[in-house]
Amino acid sequence: DLKAGGKNKKTKRTSPKSNDIYLKLLVKLYRFLVRRTDSNFNAVILKRLFMSKVNRPPLSLSRLIKYMQGKEGKIGVVVGAVTDDIRVYDVPTIKVTALKFTETARARIQKAGGECLTFDQLALRLPLTDTVLLRGPKNAREAVKHFGPAPGVPHSHTKPYVRSKGRKFEKARGRRKSRGFRV
């Protein structure tokens, strides 16, 4: 745009910030795939491998099952962690690729006859299979509840930063009719 004098001021990561050697190997592999194949899928995965942890939210088993419904035979791909969800009673047979699985999530998927793949295993099967790209909910973090219009302004449901949740900490004035007013 003109303000920046024709320069693009947006920054894009070109490599992961982390020093994790296994992540760097994956990046090396997917850089190769992006260069040698004209697959958009590989490019998206490479871009997501660079992302910060906040932008790689975990996906719970229950959401994974919901998103994979009717897509049997395809491989779910999550650039992030897959976590267990005890609210799910029976797990269907699913194939999933993720950066990380929690122990219980991995055990339950495998017990149901599913597969937990890594990204290098996925790269070997890529041309042969259909994939479903998934991500976790980014705004489900605790920190996000504190964002928005200041707590205390009308119709704001923003969570205040309180040192303790006791009776006398931001619970009375402005919170209930009997104590002055209620927003």
Curated annotation (Swiss-Prot):
Region of interest (Disordered), ranges: 146-183
SUPFAM superfamilies named in the record: Ribosomal proteins L15p and L18e
PROSITE patterns per UniProt: RIBOSOMAL_L18E (PS01106)
UniProt KW Ligase keyword: no
Family: Belongs to the eukaryotic ribosomal protein eL18 family.
Protein name: Large ribosomal subunit protein eL18
Annotated GO CC locations: cytosolic large ribosomal subunit
Basic residues composition-biased segments: 156-166, 173-183
Record key words, sorted: Ribonucleoprotein, Ribosomal protein
Stored InterPro entries: Ribosomal_eL18, Ribosomal_eL18/eL18-A/B/_CS, Ribosomal_uL15/eL18, Ribosomal_uL15/eL18_sf
GO molecular function annotation: mRNA binding; structural constituent of ribosome
Organism whose genome encodes this protein: Cicer arietinum (Chickpea)
GO biological process: translation
Lineage: Eukaryota, Viridiplantae, Streptophyta, Embryophyta, Tracheophyta
